[in-house]
Amino acid sequence: MHITLRQLEVFAEVLKSGSTTQASVMLALSQSAVSAALTDLEGQLGVQLFDRVGKRLVVNEHGRLLYPRALALLEQAVEIEQLFREDNGAIRIYASSTIGNYILPAVIARYRHDYPQLPIELSVGNSQDVMQAVLDFRVDIGFIEGPCHSTEIISEPWLEDELVVFAAPTSPLARGPVTLEQLAAAPWILRERGSGTREIVDYLLLSHLPKFEMAMELGNSEAIKHAVRHGLGISCLSRRVIEDQLQAGTLSEVAVPLPRLMRTLWRIHHRQKHLSNALRRFLDYCDPANVPR
């Protein structure tokens, strides 16, 4: 059996795109070359990797079994190439919203000041998206706002972060200490399910309320801040996210009858991920002692 990296690359691209036509475009190969590589791979394995449904290719149980192993081999092949040009490859980072928008930019700025020639790719999504990208080897390192339970991922505590309940300055809740009943009766504007912030808010805060009124779910923190500022409800986000608005007086902190709402931010990478010298150097800049507060 002589399975090639090209065959695995074709297989992975066909699975992602769902057709040999689109895969041929992404790989800059002819459609016949893509089809031949896929047929050869299935022949060597002695199984079909896709079910043919009309003109579509739908991955089956054999393909699902092969896919993570193919990705790992392709990633290792890239790492072999990078061993000889360690400082030339882009560092691929995926961070959840609070971290990617409010913490990492200052870290990356310091790194780029010292190493201006080295590229960095930063993507921002919710914590579930970050974990999936790490599992798929699409990024080198991830930063998330809640715990990760996958056995394929190594999670390391990174920073402590405080969550703050806040309202518009004109809200009655901003005028003094409030009760849990008042919090339960207020309209809440929260991050979407799947975000690390939402998971922690549900656990640390909302679990203490007898009930709560969900007014709105929004997909990013900036939208939540604007909605709260215009009096549409109250919310809970990282102090780092609303610090400027609190100081400017456009938002007000609500004094809740609970201990400080603290959470741990996590750094994650795939268990089989090779940490290159360039990546380790960047992680030195991410040391908690070096991260601006």
From Swiss-Prot:
It holds the Pfam family HTH_1. This is Uncharacterized HTH-type transcriptional regulator YeiE. Residues 1-60 form the HTH lysR-type domain. Residues 20-39 bind DNA. Belongs to the LysR transcriptional regulatory family. The keyword Repeat does not apply. SUPFAM superfamilies: Periplasmic binding protein-like II, Winged helix' DNA-binding domain. CDD domains: PBP2_CysL_like. GO terms for biological process: DNA-templated transcription; regulation of DNA-templated transcription. One of its GO terms (molecular function) is transcription cis-regulatory region binding. It comes from the Bacteria. Keywords: DNA-binding, Transcription, Transcription regulation.
